[in-house]
Amino acid sequence: MFSKVLIANRGAIAVRIERTLAKMGVKSVAVYSKADRDSLHVENADEAVYLGEGTAKDTYLDVDKIIKAALDTGAEAIHPGYGFLSENTVFAAKCEENNIKFVGPDSSQIKLFGLKHSAREIAQKANVPLLSGTGLLKGVDEAIVEAEKIGYPVMIKSTAGGGGIGIRICENKDELVASYDNVCHLAESNFNDAGVFLEKYIRKARHVEVQIFGNEYGEVATVSYTHL
């Protein structure tokens, strides 16, 4: 059990983490920008570290500042919350280098699951059912061949994409050819990775998430909700 945890986030998620830490008897360290100096997450924390002025890039996304705050306060672990640095491979690796526990996956896992095509490969090896799809494509000619095997409609997807950016639905070969380079360009400009793959498009699909928690000791728990 940790005695002190730094929360590399702000707002509601930081407050929720602070409440949980308090119930567990663990001290919390908040970080904050000038704009957030009067925020509830700063007030509720046992300690708070000022990150300076500027945008999120200058404060909450500054890996070196967050690591320094943890070292200076003696925090043994960093909880990233969601967003910000929670899926940042470099940040997780920096925590490991400084013997600070990152409350989340290790850097190698974040790297693997941060790219959709490698996540698909891992799922396939674990015999998890998947939609028909491909690995990374070498070009539009390969995309045309693979789309015929999958069957239209298909989606061109950026492997590093997120937030709906870098996805195009293609109903036929002409739409696939017209969209391919555009998706690659979007992926490169938004995620610094032009890699794309194909996946079968399901009309009127529903998005369902299941929360699964696991620790380094092999213990796994799921959280499910029943709607009456």
Question: Model-predicted segments: where are they?
Answer:
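N-terminal beta-alpha lobe that positions the nucleotide/phosphoryl donor
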Residues: 1-228
